[in-house]
Amino acid sequence: MELQVTNNFSDITSEILALAKMSEQAGSIAPELYTQYDVKRGLRDLNGKGVLAGLTNISDVRATKIVNGEAVPAHGQLFYRGYNVEDLVRGFSKDNRFGFDEVTYLLLFNKLPNKEELESFSRLLNSYRSLPTSFVRDIIMKAPSKDMMNTLARSVLTLYSYDDRADDVSLPNVLRQCLQLISLCPMLSIYGYQAYSHYHDGNSLYIHQPSQTLSMAENILHILRPDSSYTPLEAKILDIALILHMEHGGGNNSSFTTRVVTSSLSDTYSVCLLYTS
C-alpha cells in the first residue's frame, strides 16, 4: 500500500535544475590544487592509504602484511581490545553461550567480565529494552520511510524528546544513554521494517514485545518473525554477525564523523544519528 502524496513537496522544477547547475559551477575546485596544498581527499593519501586521524586501542583491522617492503593482501584479522575476535567467538561457542553482551562489555570497559559482572551487565541491558509509551504508534508507524537507515535515524533523534537529561554530557549519563541505545536500536530497526512492510508492501503488521530472558540475537529474531520462531543455529549465527559488526578500527566515515561531533560536546542522540545515517 503506497502512501498518498498530496502536494508537490518532492518536485524538481526547471528552476531548481538551473540553480543546481549554477551551484555546481560555483563550487568546483581545480583537482591540481589538492596536490598543490597536500589536501587529503576522503581521508586517503595520494598513495591510497588511510590518513592517520587519531589513536585507538578499541579495535584493529589487519588486512595486509609486509612482503619485501610492500603491503600485500592477507587473511583478514579483527581485534577487539587486543583480543583476536576469532578467539573470542571460539571461547563462547565452545561453552554454548551467546557472546554479544560479553563483547559489548569488553569494548566499553577494556576487560572481559567475570560471571557475576556479565550477569549484572546483561540484566542492565535487558532492563533498558523498553521504548517510551506509545512510541511505536506515534513515531514509527506515522509517515514510515522506505529507507531503513532513515527510519532508524529519525527514531533515535526523537528519543531526545523523551529524555529529561538529553543534554547532560557527563560520563555516567552518556554511558546510560549509550547502553539504552544499544538495547533499543534493534527494536527501532525491526519496528521500522514492520511499518515499511505493512504500509508500503501491504503485508500484515506484527509487533512483538521483547523478552527479558532472551539474548540480543534471540530477541531480534523473536521480534522480527511473524510467529517469533527461530532455530538455535540462526540465533548463534546472528550473535556472531552482530559481534563482527560492532567495531572496525574507527576509521570509516561514520566513526570519524562521530568522533569529530562528539568533541564538540553534542548530545548523545545527535551523535548516534550521524552514526546511523
Language-model segments: residues:
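Conserved small/polar residues in nucleotide/adenosyl-binding loops
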Residues: 275-276
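A short, ordered amphipathic alpha-helix with a cationic face
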Residues: 90-94, 111, 125-126, 206-211, ...
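Beta-strand-enriched accessory nucleic-acid recognition/scaffold domains that flank the catalytic cores
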Residues: 2-23, 168-175
